[in-house]
Every structure is written in C-alpha cells, then in structure tokens.
C-alpha cells in the first residue's frame, strides 16, 4: 500500500505539471474532483491543482493564438475531453473556447490535452476506480455477512416454540379417590390447561426479549460503516451482545415455574382448604421441576446454536479478510505495473525500479527476477513464482508459469528448479514440485509434473530427485516420492513412480533408494520400501519391490538392508535395524520376519535363512539366522535371542527347537523336542526340567525336578520333589502325586502304571524299584535298592538316591534328585536335570549319553576318563566341574547339558540337532533360541496367553492355552483344552483335552 500511495501521488503531481502548457484544456478538473470525492489524494495536491489552474487561465487570456482552422473544428476538438468533470476552475476559463479564433487557412494545433490525458490522467483515474470498486465490493460483502448472521439469529428466535408436555394428573386424581376425596371430573383437564397456558406465555416472553435485543443490534449495524463493523466483530462485542439475549432467561423460567405451581395449587384449594395433602403437594412440585428443566434445556439448546453461528461468522470473516487481502495485493500490484512500465520503461537503472526489483513480483508485469513472482507475469527467477507466469527460477513457483527453478513451483508452470514446485508446471528442480509440472528437482515435487529432483515430488510428474516425490511423476530422487512417478531417489517415494532412492518410496514406482519405498516401484534404497517396487535400500522396503537395503523391507521386494524387511524381497543387507516380516530373504540389523533369508540384528521371522551380526530382535520366520534376537523360524541361526524355529542356533536364549545348542542363561522352558528346560518347566520331549519347576511335566521330557506341584501326564518319565498331582501319562515319574501312567516312577504317590517305581505310594507296575518310604509293594524284578530299591541293572545306588536308577549307568552318586533313565552313565552331584537326548554335552546337568566327557559328574559311558566323577562312556575325558550329565554322543558337556547330536552345549541346553544353543532354549528346528520361550514352530510368546500356534505364553497367563503351544505358566486360571501338557499354578478349570491334568481343582 505504501508503494501504491507513492505512485498515485507521483502520477498525479506529474499530471499537474503537464497542465502548465498554454492550452486551456490542460485544467485537470476531472481528476481533482474525482480524487477529492473519493478521498484518494491529500489536500495539498488538490490545492496545487487549483493554484496552477488559475494561473494558467490568466496567462492564456493575455496571449490568444490565431489558428487557420475553422472556429467550429477547433471548438469541437477542445470540448472532447471529459466535459462532465468540472470544478471551480472551469468557471474562470469558460470563455476560453469562444476567445480562440482559428484561421481557415491553417490546420488546428495538435490536441495536446487529449494526448496527455491518454498518456497519464485517464489511466490513473480508471485505475483508481478499479481499486475503489475492488475494496468497496469487499466492504459490502463483509457487511452483508454480518447482517445475514443477525437475520438468521432472528429467524431462530422466531422459530423457538417448545411445547411443555404436562404432567400425569389422572394418576393423582385416582390416588385421591382411593383416599375418599371427591374430585370433579374436569380437574385433570383444568390442570393440563394451566400447563399449556404457562408454557405459551413463557415462550412468548423469551421470544420477545431476544427479538428486541437482536433487532436493535441489527438496526445499529445496518447504519455502520465497514470499519466500525470490523471493530465490533474483532473486539468480540458483536458476539457478546448476541449472547446477552440469554443472560436473564433463567430467572424468567423460574418465575414461570412458580406461577404454574401456584395456579395448579389453587385448583385443589378451591375444592377444600384442608384437602392439600402430601400427595398433591409432591405431584405439583414435581410438575414444576419438570417444567423448569424442560425450558432450561430448550433455551440452552438455542443458546448453543446461536453461539456456534457466532463462532462460524467470526471464522468466515477472518478467512474472507485474509483471502481478499492476498487477492487485493496481487490486483493492486498488477494495476500499478501498467503505468510503471509505460512511464519509466526501465530507464532508471542506478536506483530505480529495475535494480530494486529484488522483492516479489506479484502482478502481471512479466518479470519478477530476484523476488517472488506470484502473478501472471511469466518470469520469477530468484523469487517465488506463485502465478501463471511460466518462470520462477530461484524463488517459489506456485502458479501456472512453467518455471520455478530455485524457488517453490506450486503452479502449473512446468519448472520449479530450486524452489518447491507445487503446481502443474513440470519442473521443480531445487524446490518442491507439488503440481503437475513434471520437474521438481531440489524441492518437493508434489504435483503431476514428472520431475522433483532435490525436493519432494508429490504429484504425477515423474521426477522428484532430492525432495519427496509423492505424486505420479516417476522420479523423486533425493526427496520423498509418494506418487506414481517412478523415481524417488533421496526422498520418500510413496507413489507408483518406480524410483525413490534416498527418500521413502511408498508407491508403485520401482525405485526408492535412500528413502522409504512403500509402493510398487521396485527400488527403495535408503528409505523404507513399502510397496511393490523391488528396491528399498536404506529405508524400509514394505512392498513387493525386491530391494530394501538400509531401511525396513516390508514388502515383496527382496532387499531390506538397514530397515525392517517385511516383504518377500529376499535381501536385507547391512544395518537393517527394522523388522523383516516379509519374504525378502535379508533382514540384517532389523527384524527379519518374512521369508527373506537374512535378519541380522533384528528379528528374523520369515523363511530367509540368514540373520548375521547384532540381531537383537527375534527371528520368527524361516530365514536361517537370528543372532542377537530370537530366531523363531526355520532360519538356522538365532544367537543371543530365542531360536524357536528350525534354524539350528539358539545362543543366549532358550533353545526350544531341534538346534542342538542352548548355552548360558537359559531361563525359559523347553516344551518341544529340544532336550532341556533349565529353570522353567520342561513340558515337551526335551528330557530335562531343572530347578524351580513348579508346574507339571506333561510332555515327553522325562524330568520335572524341584517344586513340581502339578502332575506328570505325559511321556516324560520323571516328576521329582513336590509333585502333588498325579502322573497319568507315559512320563515315568510321579513323586508326591499318583503315577498312573507308564512312566516308571511314582515316589510319594501311587504308581499304578508300568513305570518301575512308586516310593511312598503303591508300586503296582513292573518298575522294579520303590526306595525310601515306599508304602506300596514291589512287584517287579529289579534286584537292588540302596536306601530305596534298585530294581534295574545299574549296579550302583549310592547315598541320598531319592529317585530310581533305571538305566544302565551304574552310578547314582550324592544328591541325585532326578532319575537317570537313559544310557549316559553319569549323574553327579546336585544333578537336577536329566539329559535324555543324543546331544553329547550336559555340563551342569546329567551326562547320560555316549559323549566321552563328564567332568565333575559321573562318567558312565565308554570314554576312558572320569576325573572327579565316573566316565562310563567312550569319550576318553571327563575333567573337573562337570555338573551336568552328558547323555549323547557329543564328547563334550561343559556347563550346560547337550542333549542332541550337536557336539556343543556351553551354558544353555541344546536339545535339537542344530549344534549350537548358547544362552536360550531352542525348542524348534531353527538352530537358535536365546532368551524367551517358544512353544510352537514360530519362535516366540513371552508374557501373555498363547492361544494360537505361536509358541509362547509365559508369565501371567490368566487365560487358557487352547493351542498346540505347550506352555501356560503362572496364574493360568482357565482350562488347558489343547495338547500342551501344562497348566501350572492356579488352574481352576478342567482339563478337557489330551493333557491329562487339572491341578488344584480337579
């Protein structure tokens, strides 16, 4: 506006100077009058016009010219310019035309006045008229909106006519009749009529009060100017005065309710002064309260509606003012540009308009180099080109120009190189190309341009290199390509472009290199490739692309390097920190949960086969590797986590599959075919369930050591101390409970099956042994029982043997709490678990196989050496500190128990055929099962209830285990209806499946 005022003043003063020419037509009466009436020029310019005009008239009267043209022609030409615009100046030279004498022999002089009018005065006047009309239309629109709002409020008030439903007076009259009171027949109708009358009166009172307030306000606003109305709205006074309608309504409602009660009470008082009973008083007071609540609710609803309308008006007026201000700025700049180009023509180069055009070009000039070109000029190089110019190089091109190189091209120009191209230009190189241009190189290409290199290409352009390509362009290199472009290199390619290199490619482009490729592009290198592109290198490849290198590959791409490869890509190389849940094949640092083959630091849950370094997640698929995480699929490796699948390795976690190795810190339970379950409950075919087993051994493990309070209902063979339930399956042992299956042992309970042992209970089977306190009978052919009865062919049963030595070991040293039922040959001091598979190593546990080494324990195989223990196998060595039992053919069993054919089982228990199982228990065929517990072939299920085929449901499982998991640890209050074999503490329901257990309440 400052520029507008300056130019108007300069142009008007130039017109004044031009009128000093000695022609009477020069008097600028029209412009002076127009700007004076419309208050567009300051008074000093008007005074200057008057002064110059009067001086010029005096000069012309003293020097009349002689012309050769006819007086008629000259006079006609002099009268042409705007005769209707006259002021006081015209009277002083009204005789100008009559005093001129034109010679017929010579032509009239050139119409200087007309030429000057066309050149400056007339365009300025017309420009002022257009600007005035623009602003006047806005003011009228603003005022009409406020008046319409008040009119609508009046309409709502006029339509406020609620009808009170009235009370149930028939019931009151019947009650009075039962009391012996004679009531006239029309009493109920009379009471209802009072309700209707009071309701109508209150409605009219509310309407009259509100209509008066709003009508007065409408009258005052109608007489206001725009600025006064705007101040009224912006200050909140308008909304406050409208809301005042409801300020005194509540007292009116209360008064009306009291009148209603008094009039209805008078009806009964007319019948009898003493008739007013408690029933009548209560009924009429209840009707009054109902009346008051009804009208309070109705007026509250009306007030809410009016307040919402007031808020809507305020919001719409603010939007109108903002939009109109923007439009007027562009309009005024366009108007000013016309006389600027015509008058100055870029002649001022040192300090004029040409050099100073560093700001924004928002009009229709055609040039807006360094500034922001928001109009229809055509050029807006360094600034922001937001109009339909065609060029907006360095700035932001948001219009339909076609060029918006360095800025943001948001229009349909086609070029928006450095800026953001958000329009349909086609080019938005460095900026953001959000339109249909086709190019949006450095910026964000969000339109249908096709190019959005450095920015974000969110449109259908095809190129969005450095930015984010979110449209259907095809290219979104550095940005995010979220459209159907095909390229979204550095950004995020979320569309169907095919390329989304550095960004996130979430569309069907095919390339999403550095970003996230979530579409069907095929490439999503650095980002996240979540689509069907095939490449998602650094990001997360969640689609069917095939590549998702550094990001998370969650689709069928094949690559998901640093992120999570959740699709069927097949590759997820270095730094994959996400989770690979698809069939890619690689999911390095992240979690590989698909069929990729690699899931290094994350969780490899698919069928990939590989999960190299730093896999901290869980490998639940068929990848083959799941190092630090939990490998729960068929991968083959699951180092520090829990390997619950068929991988082959389960280092630090729980080895619950057929891996062969479960080293240190195995805290979970072995519920599958692994061979060991250290601190937890061994409910599967493992063979061991060391210390703290509070639940029951319901599977084919063979052991259930300390604190087994449940019953051994499966084919385990052992159920040591504290077994309070009954052993109804083929386990072989049922200590304190009743051993009714074919286990072979039933210490304190009743051994009614073919176990071989029944200590404190009755031994009715062919076990052969019934040690201390056997209150039952010995009915088999064992032959020996030191402190108990030794009924097998071992040859030895030393001190403290609380269990039964039923295999061919030959030794059962001190504190053997479990039962050595296989051909290992060793069961040293404190042997709490049992190694019943063919692992080869069982350090702290029991070495019952043909390994060859059993350090501190008993060497019962053909090894040749047994230092502190007895070496009875063919290993040749059994050094010191062997606390477990080596029952397989491995040859070594340091600290843990190696119960499969692996050859190594350092700190944990390796119960499958993998060869390695470091810290956790690997219960599936993965090879790794580190820290958690896997009860199926999935690979994991820690704290909740595992009701599906997942494999896990550890602590706090309050529901029932209804699937084939095998585990339902603490607090299982429901019933075990599946083939799990376990229902530990607090199982209050019944065992209706094939588990054979129902602990505390069965």
From Swiss-Prot:
Which stretches of sequence are listed as region 50 X 12 AA tandem repeats of E-E-G-E-D-K-D-N-T-G-E-G? 357-998
Q: What is this protein called?
A: Spore wall protein 2
Quaternary context: Component of a complex composed of at least SWP1 and SWP2.
Main location class? other
Q: Which GO terms describe its biological process?
A: sporulation resulting in formation of a cellular spore
Comp. bias (Acidic residues): 354-1002
> Is Glycoprotein among this UniProt entry's keywords?
yes
Primary role: Spore wall component.
Q: Where in the cell is it found?
A: Spore, Perispore
Further remarks about this protein from its record: SWP2 is a major antigen recognized during host infection.
Annotated glycosylation sites: 308
Keyword match NADP: no
Using the UniProt annotation, give all residue ranges assigned to the region (Disordered): 349-1002
Keyword list, A-Z: Glycoprotein, Repeat, Signal, Sporulation
Organism field: Encephalitozoon intestinalis
Q: Which domain of life is it from?
A: Eukaryota
Which residue positions does the secretion signal occupy? 1-18
Map the sequence repeats onto residue numbers: 357-368, 369-380, 381-392, 393-404, 405-416, 417-428, 429-440, 441-452, 453-464, 465-476, 477-488, 489-500, 501-512, 513-524, 525-536, 537-548, 549-560, 561-572, 576-587, 588-599, 600-611, 615-626, 627-638, 639-650, 651-662, 663-674, 678-689, 693-704, 708-719, 723-734, 735-746, 747-758, 759-770, 774-785, 786-797, 801-812, 816-827, 831-842, 843-854, 855-866, 867-878, 882-893, 894-905, 906-915, 918-929, 930-941, 942-953, 957-969, 972-983, 987-998
